[in-house]
Every structure is written in structure tokens, then in C-alpha cells.
Amino acid sequence: MTPDSPLMPVVLRRRSSLALALCLLCVLCPQTLSAQAPAPGLPITKPSDVGLSLQRLSAIGDWLRAEVAAKRIPGAVVMVARGGKLAYVEAVGQRDPTIPAAMKTDDLFRIYSMTKPVVSVAALMLVEDGRLLLEAPVARYIPAFANVKVGIEKTDAQGNKTLDLVAPRRAMTVQDLLRHTSGLTYGFFGDGLVKKAYQDANISAGGNQTLAEFADRIAQMPLAYQPGSTWDYSNSTDVLGRVIEVASGQSLYTHLKARLLDPLGMTDTTFYVPEPARQARIAEPWPDDRSIGVNAPVFDPRQIMPMESGGGGLVSSAPDYARFLLMLRNGGQLDGKRYLSPATLAFMTTDHLSPAVLKTPLYLPGPGYGFGLGFAVRTSAGEAAYPASPGEFYWGGAGGTYMWVDPAQDLFVVFMMQSPRQRVPYRSVLRNMVNAAVIERLPAAR
């Protein structure tokens, strides 16, 4: 990368979104980039024009290339935007470590739980439409939840544990699904009798079941906690996907595609990848790094299955997800089309966990963060191990993907890789290196 180049030269093969392709193809001629007309909705700028240090941004690419050379990750794509403009794009390493093909910026990644913010936004769009209520019981949309029970562990004098089933103190609501206070859980990590029951019943999002069948099955399982009492990472957003289906009268993907993905130009964001040309662009992890948890192998998006997992099933690209984040950065609109009102988006990215809500030991948002409706939300400048502004929001995926939006810094970042074992340490390093590149303040976007 030359000192005056705002972006690493890359080659794009994306044809499905002409505006986005034209925008990113500008990086083929970095010396003349400033003279290029930006594409609508995703313009490019020089780092120095938005208060970023090119030298410090370039260090991110150097770090990632060193990690690839050390065979710790196969490859990665990173995008840094400020002031609503892409200021840095880098693709390093290989798309698939078993095939000698360089990573491209528009390659496809299993984004796992970065599906959750997309589905959460779709749910709030239905709220704005008047077709969904956050305070409504989940049972209004999925009747099987009308008879749900809470599992209470008891231990006798000999140390034997049993599970008593009791009625919930209140109904599980749609808002509970969005903020992970539903009482549902995940069975592939942690311990306890409810989690063991999930494992024994093979409760997982995927396989040869429809979303409706999955929702009915998980409704028969005991809740790990009283609804509203405890934050526990869970299949809540999968159940939310079924709520969206019932409220909209469409399959989850049909609804996402019509209301969000196609209008945003996110044509590479799908649950499955049946097309051979797109299959060739799927990023893969190392052969010995293909599990995200107990009995949870990395899924194969080439195989079309009945279920569309709202909690972790989407495949996407860095440019697609950048479009989604740019819409959020813009207060809910992009290219003249509004998806959410500014008030609704502010509501989503506000902490929804009162002091009375307990947090499990595996509290994924981390110190200094609460949780909104689909996002972890920074609540204080301190506590966390890296700088961020109060109001910053983020989330990531089990396969290694990560994103954050910092409205006070007018900054957003997309990071894509397929390295499940490396996902946590790389996030903090990336945060610190991006923060180091912010050398001037800009007015907040909103």
C-alpha cells in the first residue's frame, strides 16, 4: 500500500449490486480515488479527510498478514468507515486454506450471530408497522409457548440434582426475545440440568426441521430462568424469527429479502448458497477449527435445509454488512429510503437491562456494556478493556465475524473471518488498533 493510498487495492467480482461494485472498484486506482464520484450510499474517502491515520490503519493489515503467515487464521476482510464513508478496506490471506485462492473483499462468510441484529431490525420495522408489539406475550404468535414451564434445580442431601417445573411468574414477551431475557438458553455451552435437557433433546437451530417446528419444540423445553429475570444468551432470536413469520405472513427470508436485504442492496446476504458461482466465494476455516461448541460443527451453507435460523444462519459479505451498518449510522435510512425512525433506532441501541436483571457468568456483552434490542450497548467509558463511547453498540458471530458502530466517533467497522477459535482475542486487538487510528474528532452522526 502506498503512503497516499486511502485503500488497499482490491479486486471485486461482485456484479449483483452495481452501485456498490462501482464504489469499491475505485480502489483499483487509489491515486485518483479523490476524483472518483462516490456511489450512492457507500462513498469512499481518504482516511486523513475523516480524522484517521492511514499509517495506523495500515498497521491493521500488517498485523493480519502476520497472523496469516503464522497460520493462525486463513484470511480476513476489514472495513473501517467514518463520517459515513469507507476510509479503509483490506483483504488478506486465503479464502479457503485448502485452496490457493486469495481472499477478496466480497467473499462470503457465515456470520452466525451477526444475523441477530438484522432480524432484530426487521422485528422493529414490524413494530413500526403496527403488526407486532414488544409487550405482547410470545404465545400470542406461537401458541405452544402458552404452557411453558421454568426449570428450578434442587439438590438433595446426597448431592443429587433434580429439576422441578414451575409456572412462570409472568409471560415471556417479544421484548424478552430481543434482549435475551426470555428464559430460553443455548444447549451447546455451559452446564446445568436445563442445558443438559436441551442437549438430550437435540435442541439446535438447523437440521431437518422448519422454523415453526423448531419453535414448537423449544416451547416444550423448561426455561432456564424466570422470564425477564436474567440475561442469558439463547435461541431467543430464532424464536423471534418465527414471530416475524407469523406477524408478516411470510417466511423469514422472504420477509427479510423484501423489507430489508434487497432494498439495502444486500444481495449476497442469504441463509443458503445454492449457486455454484457464489459457493466458490465462501470463506472456510482451518480443517481443525470447524466447531463453535459442543455438538455444534460449522454449518455448510451449500446445503439447503428447511430451517432459516434468525439467530445465526445468514451468510453475508463485508460490503453487504457495511450497507446495513451505514443505514444504522444514518439513523435508520439509506439512499433516500427509511427503514426505521431515529427514535426507534435510538430505542434499540439503549440498554434495556434494569439493575434488577441478573447476568449469567457468560455475559457476552462484557464489562461496561448493557444490552439493547439486538445489540450490546456501551453504558460507560470505563470498565471495558478497550475504549469506546457510551452509546456505541456491537455484536459478533461464532465463526469469527464482528462489527461495531460508535455514533459519538461517527465510526463503524466490519470484520470478517472464519476462525471460530480466534474470534475473541482478535476482536480486542482490532478494537485497539482502530481506536489508535482515530486522531481527530468529528461531529457525531446522530
Regions found by a protein language model. Name each.
Residues P40-G41, R140-A388:
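Short, surface-exposed loop or secondary-structure junction motifs
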Residues L42-I111, R131-L133, N147-D156, V298-F299, ...:
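Short, conserved catalytic-motif segment at the N-terminal edge
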Residues S34-A35:
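Boundary at the C-terminal end of the N-terminal hydrophobic targeting segment
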Residues S53, K116, S317:
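Short, conserved phosphate/pyrophosphate- and ester-handling motifs at nucleotide-, phospho-/glycolipid
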Residues S58-R65, V78, G84, F109-Y141, ...:
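Active-site SXXK
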Residues A19-Q31:
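Bacterial N-terminal signal peptides
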Residues D4-L20:
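Bacterial N-terminal signal peptides that target proteins for export
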Residues Y402-W404, D410-S419:
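Short, well-ordered beta-strand elements
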